Amino acid sequence: MSLKVAFLNENARAPTRGSVHAAGYDLYAAEEKTIPANGRGLVDLGLSMSIPEGTYARIAPRSGLAVKNGLSTGAGVIDYDYRGPVKVMLFNHSTEDFNVTIGDRVAQMILERIVTPEVQVVQTNDLESTERGAGGFGSTGINDEKKRKLDEAEAKE
């Protein structure tokens, strides 16, 4: 299995892993760009790729940029059949502009295997029941006492 990368301009760099056990490949900016404070910007990587069949690439933030500069990524899926230019959407959650320079590591790419089952529409009562049921939005992260109180409050409504 290989990840094929084609350079689209002279500033492009191939993705690299920071260590032999790193899950992600660092992605490098091929252009200078200012991400405005509390804003966003699309950063060109200057390359296109051939993702291995049976996988997709997920674009994720680099932890250092997130912690030190308040940057995160968005719109981060590269499908197996996409062959166009790869760009990274950066969100700047800080109150200061962030300047990207050519060669900066702006995100990481993680290859993940995918499963694409056939969609089958069924009635609600045909779904397998589970212990969790319809509990969501933090329902599994509360202690038993809080859960009991919430259940009692819902029963009164």
Curated annotation (Swiss-Prot):
The protein's annotated pathway: Pyrimidine metabolism; dUMP biosynthesis; dUMP from dCTP (dUTP route): step 2/2
First-tier enzyme category under EC: hydrolase
Binding site for dUMP: 63, 76, 79, 82, 87, 132, 137-138
One Pfam family matching this protein: dUTPase
Cystine pairings recorded for this chain: none
GO molecular function: dUTP diphosphatase activity; magnesium ion binding
Keywords from the UniProt entry: Hydrolase, Magnesium, Metal-binding, Nucleotide metabolism
Highest taxon listed in the record's lineage: Eukaryota
Reactions listed under catalytic activity: dUTP + H2O = dUMP + diphosphate + H(+)
Gene Ontology biological process: dUMP biosynthetic process; dUTP catabolic process
CDD domains named among the record's database cross-references: trimeric_dUTPase
EC number: 3.6.1.23
Positions of region (Disordered): 125-157
Listed Basic and acidic residues bias regions: 143-157
Cofactor entry: Mg(2+)
Function as written in the Swiss-Prot or TrEMBL entry: Involved in nucleotide metabolism via production of dUMP, the immediate precursor of thymidine nucleotides, and decreases the intracellular concentration of dUTP so that uracil cannot be incorporated into DNA.
Subunit relationships: Homotrimer.
Family note: Belongs to the dUTPase family.
Name under which the protein is recorded: Deoxyuridine 5'-triphosphate nucleotidohydrolase
Gene: DUT1
